[in-house]
């Protein structure tokens, strides 16, 4: 991460909080996919860096390539937030899913592995600062429940 904040993040499994699920449709009712939230190690006094990836067009159990991605970077406890404000600045090059648990019919948990990059910065919503997340890769947990938020919209 470079810009208003210069950091090299190298978080390990036990240090991270990770959860994910279906991404709600966007304004055009077409931008679905998954949302993955990854919180880094506790930095004391309620401070933690959290990255939220909104990956468009990903369906339950299916791999993806070149998926447009919205990225939000939160500095919890510091009142700082950066966002790409759309999925046109970052891309997930490759995403794989492996079912790890079935909780009930139409309710499953997947291990998701993703790798990608950003060509444009995330901007602070209040101060005009910018940061560029040059590249990222992560593995996390995504839970799909008995709903259709992750399914592609029906064609008219």
Q: Can you say where each PLM-predicted feature lies in the sequence?
A:
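Residue-level recognition of conserved structural "scaffold" positions that shape functional pockets
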Residues: 10, 121-123, 147
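Short, low-complexity, Pro/Ser/Thr/Gly-rich segments in the mature regions of secreted, periplasmic
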Residues: 137-156
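Acidic, glycine-rich flexible loop segments
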Residues: 62-142
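Amphipathic, positively biased hydrophobic alpha-helical segments used for protein targeting
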Residues: 29-31, 125, 151
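An ectodomain-focused feature that recognizes extracytoplasmic/extracellular
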Residues: 1-88
């Amino acid at each position: 991460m470079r810009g208003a904040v210069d950091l090299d993040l190298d978080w390990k499994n036990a240090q991270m909080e990770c959860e994910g699920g279906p991404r709600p449709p966007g304004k055009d009712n077409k931008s679905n996919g998954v949302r993955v939230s990854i919180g880094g190690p506790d930095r004391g006094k309620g401070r933690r860096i959290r990255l939220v990836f909104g990956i468009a067009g990903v369906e339950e159990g299916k791999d993806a390539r070149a998926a447009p991605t919205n990225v939000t970077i939160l500095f919890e406890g510091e009142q700082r937030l950066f966002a790409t404000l759309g999925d046109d600045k970052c891309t997930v090059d490759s995403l794989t899913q492996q079912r790890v648990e079935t909780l009930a019919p139409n309710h499953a948990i997947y291990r998701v592995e993703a790798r990608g990059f950003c060509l444009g910065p995330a901007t602070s919503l209040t101060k005009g600062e910018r940061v560029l997340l040059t590249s990222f890769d992560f593995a996390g947990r995504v839970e799909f429940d008995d709903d259709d938020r992750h399914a592609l919209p029906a064609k008219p």
